[in-house]
């Protein structure tokens, strides 16, 4: 039984899987967009989000941890100087997965995984918004009960 065993095996042994993830993380951070299969992209998203969070920390220990995963020192520099500062206000969710369709050879679902570009604006709910929503729901309920009462009286 596979109870409490998270992560996909992707048809590879552990060392091959780790090497593939390191290669894909390096490519994604270098090019900021890659095409791959759906399962690989979902696993890659976890590692890339962790690397960008390390980049946001920005200290020497975080840089050394990133070097363990990212295989190119230039890409590590790009992560810490260019990519991570774009996401200082964003609390996670640095990547986007866009479905493309299935691959011709083996019908595997293909996706594009890319770094999110637009600015993050945190949603702030105001008391006025909550009050307006509550009032609109109350008026809809009142109208529905009136309509039900009118139809009952018409009968």
UniProtKB/Swiss-Prot annotation:
Transmembrane spans: none
Single GO biological process annotation from the record: translation
A GO CC annotation given for this chain: cytosolic large ribosomal subunit
One example GO MF annotation: structural constituent of ribosome
Alphabetical list of Gene3D superfamilies matching this protein: Ribosomal protein L17 (3.90.1030.10)
Ribosomal protein as UniProt keyword: yes
Entry superkingdom: Bacteria
Alphabetized UniProt keyword annotations: Ribonucleoprotein, Ribosomal protein
Pfam family, one: Ribosomal_L17
Family of this protein: Belongs to the bacterial ribosomal protein bL17 family.
HAMAP family: Ribosomal_bL17
Subunit structure: Part of the 50S ribosomal subunit. Contacts protein L32.
NCBIfam families the record matches: L17
Listed name of the protein: Large ribosomal subunit protein bL17
Naturally occurring in which organism (per UniProt): Syntrophotalea carbinolica (strain DSM 2380 / NBRC 103641 / GraBd1)
Gene (name only): rplQ
């Amino acid at each position: 039984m596979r109870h409490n065993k998270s992560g996909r095996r992707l048809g590879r042994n552990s060392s091959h899987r780790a090497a593939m993830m390191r290669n894909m993380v390096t490519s994604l951070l270098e090019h900021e967009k890659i095409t791959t299969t759906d399962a690989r992209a979902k696993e890659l998203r976890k590692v890339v989000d962790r690397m960008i969070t390390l980049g946001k920390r920005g200290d020497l220990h975080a840089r050394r941890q990133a070097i363990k995963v990212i295989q190119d020192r230039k890409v590590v520099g790009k992560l810490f100087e260019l990519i991570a500062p774009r996401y200082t206000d964003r609390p996670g969710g640095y990547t986007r997965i866009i479905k493309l369709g299935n691959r011709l050879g083996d019908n595997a679902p293909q996706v594009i995984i890319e770094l999110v570009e637009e600015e993050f604006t945190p949603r702030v709910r105001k008391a006025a918004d909550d009050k307006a929503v509550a009032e609109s729901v109350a008026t809809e309920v009142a109208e529905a009960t009136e309509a039900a009462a009118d139809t009952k009286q018409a009968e």
